[in-house]
Every structure is written in structure tokens, then in C-alpha cells.
Amino acid sequence: MNERDVKVRIHGIDEMGSAADGPGVRSVVFFQGCHRHCPGCHNPETWSPCGGAETTVGAVEDHLLAVRTRRVTISGGEPLEQLTALRALIARLNADGFDIALYTGGSRDEIPEDIARSVRHLKTGAFVQELRTTTKPFVGSSNQTFWSAA
């Protein structure tokens, strides 16, 4: 199957630009569905695997190509819960020259190596409300880690 035809369920796309979801002003793609249900989650509307809208990787790619920035963060929800779509979207965005960040509540060990090698930035770790921070860049709680490739 062509990567562009792969189905993906997203909550939405913030193309207005975020400076909180990785280096530089970035668009954010919010994947739909998350089993973690972290108390205090910033995006609880993304939890239901049936919410949001089903679309194609190609439609998401086209939407992002129409935006001026070539920086994008894939967040959610939990992107790792849609591995086929995540791999296809990352492949398409890399082909288009995007700087990609992936936000996951999982640990570094939970991220498949092919995905970890295909993105420039990773945010790992579940949000813990008692550890909430506003002083550590690009994370919501101090237990989370933000990784950048050299």
C-alpha cells in the first residue's frame, strides 16, 4: 500500500505554530487515542480511540505542506498506538524535508528503533501531575525527557 493511502485517526492539526512543542515554531499533528489517561493531561480529548476523524497520511501531508513552517511535532493522544500510520507519516514528512519531533508518553525503550532513527527530536515519559514543571523546555513534568539528534 502507498504510504499516502494509509489511514490515520487524528484529533486535529495546529498549523498556527507552537513554540512549546519542540525547537522553533512548529505545526502539531495530534493523533487520536491514548490508553495512558494521565491525570492532568493537557489533551484529554485525544484519549478516545473513536474520537477525532479518520483521514489519510496523504491528506495530513498535504495540509502540512500548505503551511509555511517545515517543523512539525507529532503528538496526541499516543502516536505509538497507530504504528503503521506513524511510520508512513514520518516517511512522507522526511521525504518532504520536515524537522520532525515525536511526543510519546512511552519510555525510550518503547519506541521502535526505526521510528527513533527517523525523527530529529523525541519527548519521552508519561505526564505526572505532581511533577509538573514550567522551567524544563518542551516537557510538562520533570520526569519527562526531551532528546535531540546531533
What is each PLM-predicted segment?
Residues 1-30, 35, 39, 43-49:
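N-terminal [4Fe-4S]-dependent radical SAM core
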Residues 48-59, 80-116, 121:
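Canonical radical SAM enzyme core domain
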Residues 80-91, 132-150:
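P-loop/Walker A phosphate-binding loop and immediately adjacent motor/lid segment at beta-alpha junctions
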